[in-house]
């Protein structure tokens, strides 16, 4: 699927054809969902460990959908907004809040509202506020 001017369209057979149809200087976002899905499938099948998609790389909903349908069911999130986005689209996914700096409200909401149970810390002292916020829920 190619996206032109934020409108989903399958009417362009290639990126070149889409670019040729443009007569103005606005940015164009092209997403190749099949390519993303096939790459996700390759990683999910051949990597020996658990494969996570880092939402920070590209949080576009069509990218998340392609990763999910390609077999990547778990996501590395770095903010409460990313938690909300993935939860809304892929509610059965396991999320991993890997960013080492997290606001207490982000911890509390991720744990209490969205059921996150996987958090990363970069030092044992950072675990104290994490544990406190999780215990209050």
Can you describe what each PLM-predicted range is?
Residues 1-137:
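A charged N-terminal "starter" segment
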């Amino acid at each position: 699927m190619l996206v032109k001017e934020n409108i989903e369209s399958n009417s362009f057979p290639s990126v070149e054809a889409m670019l040729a149809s443009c007569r103005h200087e606005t940015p164009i976002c092209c997403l190749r969902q099949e390519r993303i899905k096939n790459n996700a499938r390759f990683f999910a099948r051949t990597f020996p460990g658990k494969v996570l998609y880092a939402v920070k790389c590209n949080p576009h909903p069509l990218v998340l959908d392609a990763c999910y349908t390609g077999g990547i069911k778990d996501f590395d999130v770095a903010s409460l907004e990313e938690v909300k986005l993935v939860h809304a689209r892929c509610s059965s996914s396991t999320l991993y809040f890997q960013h080492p700096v997290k606001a207490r409200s982000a911890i509390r909401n991720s744990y209490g509202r969205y059921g996150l149970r996987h958090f990363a810390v970069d030092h044992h002292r950072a675990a104290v506020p994490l544990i406190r916020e999780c215990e209050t829920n």
